[in-house]
């Protein structure tokens, strides 16, 4: 498994803030991968009416289910390809060798619930279920989708896959693009100007 933490929004950056290659049994790989992603995730406080609500870059349930899915449904007969985790400023991408059910090609698909719950590796799936690492009764993609239900459409998970690889992208719920920051700061400055002008002032006060 290759785990990479990039500076920026793509792999064109010359700076990798963290880079690890991990081996071991599937349970250890699962734990190490989840820990790697959570370690490089941020947490914050969202203001509510009376207090604050703690929020994270990614719903932890979504991370756990996406990681488990990559291990449980990987095509282990496809040599020369490894499971990859790439963390960028605004998202985490988890790539696994092996197609979706029926080899259907998907590009930027947000309809996770349409994915057929097909088990490529029955024994691995059963082991994860016995160890309470996954549920038999509820598909992982359904839980991933549900964990993002409070967020806007542009933050919803995306699936890309073809006949050889399957990739799920989870977007950082705390990320603010430069445009968002400009808009946010601009609105704050606008409100300050309105507040200043709403109160009568002398020429001297305005000059200062």
Regions found by a protein language model. Give the residues of each.
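C-terminal regulatory or interaction extensions
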Residues: 1-208
